[in-house]
C-alpha cells in the first residue's frame, strides 16, 4: 500500500489496536514537528536574506554621502503603485522587498561623480549611465524570485516608454513591469527629495511633471495608477523624512501604510 507505514489485520485485538494507533499518532506528531522546524528555518533564511539586502542598500547610501530613508520611501512607493495597478498581494510585497537594490549599481560609479555638488558633465553622465548594468551584474542571475525582481528593477528602471532610455533602449511593453513601476517611483523620489544640485519640489509638482511625461518617459497605465495614490506618496514622504535617528531599526520590506 503506497505511503503505508503500518496496518492492522483482523481479527482486531484491543491492546494491539491501541498500540498501533498510538504509534501512528506519534508519527504524525513527529512529522508536524519536522514541518514546523523546516518552516522556522525557511523564515530565518528569508529574514537573513532581507537583512543582507538592507545592509547592501545602506552601504550604497554611505558611499553616496550618508544614510537617508530613500530606499525605505521607494519601497513603499513601489508597494502603493503595485497595489494601485491591481497586482496580487504577494507580488506587491515581493516587488516592495526587492526595491532597495534598484540603485545598487551606483556602487560601481566613481565616488567623485556620486558626491559631486554641481550638475554632471557629459563624460560624468556617461559613467553614471553604466549603473543599471553594473547593478544587474552585482545582483547576478538567480532563480530566487526576490533577487530576480531586484535584478530586473536595477537593470531597467531608466528605460523609457518611448524607447529613448538606457541601457538597452527598450520600448513600451518590452520594458518589464517592475522596471516601469520603479521608473515612476524613482522619478518621484528624485524630484521630491533634496539633491546636491537642486532643491526638492512638492508632491503635486512632481505629479504634474510625471503626468506630462506619460507616454514618453513613463507607461501611461502606471502614470494613471500613480495619480490615484499621489496623496499616499506624499504621506510616505512626510512620514519618512531624511533623519538619522532610528534609521537602523527601519523595516525596508514592510508593506506601505495607508
Residues of each region from the PLM?
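Ser/Thr-centric signal marking residues that sit
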Residues: 9, 42, 192
Amino acid at each position: 500500500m503506497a505511503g503505508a507505514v503500518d496496518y492492522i489485520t483482523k481479527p482486531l485485538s484491543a491492546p494491539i489496536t491501541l498500540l498501533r494507533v498510538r504509534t501512528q499518532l506519534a508519527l504524525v506528531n513527529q512529522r508536524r514537528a519536522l514541518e514546523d522546524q523546516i518552516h522556522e528555518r525557511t523564515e530565518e533564511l528569508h529574514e537573513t536574506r532581507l537583512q543582507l539586502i538592507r545592509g547592501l542598500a545602506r552601504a550604497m547610501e554611505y558611499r553616496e554621502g550618508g544614510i537617508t530613508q530613500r530606499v525605505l520611501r521607494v519601497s513603499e512607493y513601489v508597494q502603493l503603485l503595485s497595489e494601485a495597478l491591481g497586482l496580487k498581494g504577494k507580488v506587491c510585497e515581493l516587488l516592495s522587498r526587492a526595491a532597495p537594490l534598484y540603485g545598487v549599481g551606483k556602487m560601481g560609479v566613481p565616488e567623485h561623480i556620486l558626491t559631486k555638488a554641481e550638475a554632471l558633465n557629459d563624460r560624468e553622465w556617461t559613467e553614471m549611465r553604466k549603473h543599471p548594468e553594473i547593478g544587474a551584474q552585482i545582483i547576478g542571475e538567480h532563480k530566487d524570485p526576490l533577487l530576480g525582481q531586484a535584478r530586473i528593477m536595477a537593470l531597467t528602471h531608466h528605460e523609457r516608454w518611448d524607447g529613448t532610455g538606457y541601457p538597452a533602449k527598450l520600448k513600451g511593453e518590452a520594458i518589464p513591469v517592475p522596471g516601469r513601476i520603479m521608473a515612476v517611483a524613482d522619478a518621484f523620489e528624485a524630484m521630491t527629495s533634496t539633491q546636491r544640485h537642486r532643491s526638492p519640489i512638492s508632491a503635486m509638482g512632481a505629479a504634474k511633471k510625471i503626468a506630462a511625461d506619460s507616454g514618453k518617459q513613463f507607461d501611461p497605465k502606471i502614470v494613471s495608477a500613480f495619480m490615484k495614490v499621489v496623496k499616499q506618496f506624499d504621506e510616505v514622504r512626510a512620514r519618512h523624512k531624511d533623519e538619522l535617528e532610528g534609521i537602523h531599526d527601519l523595516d525596508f520590506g514592510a508593506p506601505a501604510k495607508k
